[in-house]
Amino acid sequence: MPILLAVNLAHSRLPVLSSVLVAGVLLLGLPAASAAQGVAGTVPEETIRSQVPAPSVRAAAAIVYNTETGDVLWESNSGAQRSIASITKLMTAVVFMEESPDLSAVVTITREDVRRASTTYLRAGFKVTKGDLLHLTLIASDNAAARTLARVSDHGSEAFVARMNSKAEELGLTITRYADPSGLSNDNVSSALDMAKLLTYVSGDVRLTDVMQKQSYSVPVVGRRAPILIRSTNQLVRNGDVDVVAGKTGFIRSAGYCLATLLRLPQGGPPVAVVVLGATSNAGRFREVRSLFDWFAKAAPDLLGHAVVPFGAD
């Protein structure tokens, strides 16, 4: 007689292929791995676990997500709601670009834009283009730039945040709530799973991915002789030894160190989203994302059903 097995994996640190429930039918006398074969589009959990041990991750929440199929390949507390700090700026950029703005239009920075901005290269009175504000927002995580994008949008700052929340709802980001465009508010919250889904959406806009792949950028300021030179806050981009399709860092005390990335194997194929929230240090977030990506590279033949050379192999 078949037995229906439903396992809640929402807080598991083992490789999984569903963010909430995996259902399988176990026939008497058959091992769990055999029954798992009956779940369409999945891989036997036991096979993955025994062949490629999952890495140890200290971040409060993390996920490895297949952007092509929507499968959760590995997770730890990926559905937990947490403060996301400047990862908020991903949605800021999405909503701003959906207005099809004139990126060459020049904007004057106001005192309110830079007030208590914490991290900014801008000063009141600076004149920069909307396109350069986008670069400052995504590359340097400039809070004043993100605020300015919202202010100069079609409907102003307050309506902009409302549109960020509407877009989150449209994309099915059920855990996500936005309170401001910069990420400085503790009330910008989401989950690792929701951010993986948002990265998947972002991957379809080359205007955004092209910006996030830049290691550095020069921002001209109208009437100022020297440009502003900025570097990516994403160490994986700066190092250049892994193919980063898109990514955003974030940190405030309530969020811890956060990193949402879209990475591609050297052999190509669809990118995988790797997100860590609440890492214990700046270096730790990059180390743990890289550890999870290296695990994915080794586990990919099982997870994706084709041969892949482990990342970094000779």
Where on the chain are the PLM-derived regions?
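N-terminal secretory signal peptides that target proteins for export/translocation
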Residues: M1-R13
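Intrinsically disordered, low-complexity segments
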Residues: A10, V16-L17, A32
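Bacterial N-terminal signal peptides
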Residues: S18-G29
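Active-site-adjacent loops and short helices of periplasmic peptidoglycan-processing enzymes
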Residues: A36-L193, K197-V206
